């Protein structure tokens, strides 16, 4: 386009002037170039901004997905730690069960040995009936210890009931926590579904934006192609206008030359007409003179002939001289006839040249009329081209207005979508924070409840075993009392063995309680350690 403008300018400078149509076309081409460059820069900036916005959204989505993956990995690690802790707790429970089995085996061995001793002492008691008072005092002491042991067993039973109530309350609390955890898990599942739906909607919106961007790019390409087509059409119109102007100039030059030729021919025609008129007048004068001369000569000849005849008769001797005069007259007549023929040939030639000049004049006038008609047609085509250029300008302005309106609509839609995405990002972040806090609290409470439940179950199992042992011991003591009351003379070694056995059982029960307390403390420490690890991981 610039090359075309430069060519027009150079041709205008070489010609010395620019026509109004060329100036308008040049100004139109400059305006079109400026508009195209401006719109192209605007479209490139807008497309670049849209691409950067889409890249930012893609990066944010990738960051959110990476955070979700990290959270899923942390949850998996926590599940593994919980499974490992459950395995360790199960192993510890198995160890404690094995120890309880060992204790029960020892108790069974002691019972068997006690029964053997009881049988032996009964045999000895049947053979010996001494020191009844000491035995009775020993029995009273043993009964007091048995009462103390019963009181302790009652206290243990009360403590067992308290522990059982605590375990039932903890079990109810665990059930409530389990229900709460199910509710929270359902809420978390709903929130995850909401997050997934939000992600899907954001992805669909991003796809919608990308499709809109592609459509905008397609429209931009279509507009650029339309502008290129219009530019090509304008160039073609410029070329046709230039060719028309060149043809118009050539025809104007031909018209000028033909007008000059016509003027020259008209002058020549005038000259020929004048010369023809002069020659015609000269010929007419010559003809008149010749006619007069011929008439005069004829009259003279008649008179001379008459005279000669008259004189012939009179003067026959003068006959030779009359014959010469007659010859002279005849020669003059021949000369006049030849000159007349020459003049007639010249007149015919001049008439033919006049007819040829008139035909050339007619042809030139016809050519002038045709050229005038062609000039009128060229002016009509030029007006049509100007109207087409105006229409193209209007089309370009309409396309620009429609594109600007569509671009404004796209900008408003993109701003609304960005605001909605920002709000959704805020809601997603708050939901993630609240869900992570609830997950932490729920996991901590569930761990505490599980640990307490395990501890209380173990304590209850141990207390149940102690209660069974106390029952067995109380039954054995009752049997001993019955045996002692039935016997009239108890033996002191039996009381010593019973007191020793009761002291050993009391020590063993204290030892079991201490071990239970140590185990409870150890479980508490482990639960605190796991809670600290979990909080550190979170």
Curated annotation (Swiss-Prot):
Q: List the GO cellular component terms.
A: centriolar satellite; centriole; centrosome; cytoplasm; spindle pole
Q: How is it modified after translation?
A: Polyubiquitinated via 'Lys-48'-linked ubiquitin, leading to its degradation. Deubiquitinated by USP36, promoting its stabilization.
Swiss-Prot/TrEMBL keywords: Acetylation, Cell cycle, Cell division, Coiled coil, Cytoplasm, Cytoskeleton, DNA damage, Mitosis, Ubl conjugation
For whether the record's keyword set contains Cell cycle, the answer is yes
Q: Which GO terms describe its biological process?
A: cell division; centriole replication; centrosome duplication; de novo centriole assembly involved in multi-ciliated epithelial cell differentiation; DNA damage checkpoint signaling; intrinsic apoptotic signaling pathway by p53 class mediator; meiotic telomere clustering; negative regulation of innate immune response
Could you describe the subunit structure of this protein?
Answer: Interacts with CEP152 and CDK1; these interactions recruit both ligands to centrosomes. Interacts with CDK2, CDK5RAP2, WDR62, CEP90, KIAA0753/moonraker and CCDC14. CEP63, CDK5RAP2, CEP152, WDR62 are proposed to form a stepwise assembled complex at the centrosome forming a ring near parental centrioles. Interacts with CCDC57; the interaction is required for their location to proximal end of centrioles. Interacts with FXR1; promoting its stabilization.
UniProt lists the family membership as follows: Belongs to the CEP63 family.
Q: What is this protein called?
A: Centrosomal protein of 63 kDa
Name the species this protein comes from. Rattus norvegicus (Rat)
